Amino acid sequence: MLLNKARAYEYMDRNGLDALVAQMSINVYYLSDYWGSLNWPGFFDGTYFAILPRREDAPASLVIPSFAIRRLASEGGTWMPNVFSYSTPEEGATLDDDTPAGLDYEGWPLRPGVPLTAREQSWVDITRRLRDQMSADAVWAVVRALRAAGLEGKRLGCDDERTGAWLAGRGFDARCEYRRDVFNQVRLVKTPREV
């Protein structure tokens, strides 16, 4: 794990934050151990997110686009227990939590009876697990992740100034603070895996 959790918790405590919300590629990678295929600085902003709650019993979450589901399996996954994904909005459809749904994601077509390698089977398995829980877009997936961690109405340290406006636009109540400094302070002390 790249993340120094103890240091992250220490800096959240020092700054009165209930969670860290990463959108910058390097911070998403640092928090989640997942590097997406579109995770390049300055490109495809708002494609991937990682949420690290301060409460240790609240689930951390990774948000990825539907086409990245198979890559998540190929790259060894993430230590984060929750993965929220998104696809194209499905007109008028909602998920169980009343947020707008995306179209179910089926992945690549699969011919019946064809033997699969272990890697191919892992792609099928993760697609089946996540396919019918697609959010309508990335921000709705972030809202779902934050709600799952009980972070509504809480103070969030964000590494992108736009995150608060994106969440407010979805009616999510939280105090979003631009706190790239906290991310930088946490990352100053390297974990053995980083070195």
Set out the residue ranges of the language-model regions:
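A composition/biophysics-driven feature that prefers long, compositionally simple stretches
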Residues: M1-V195
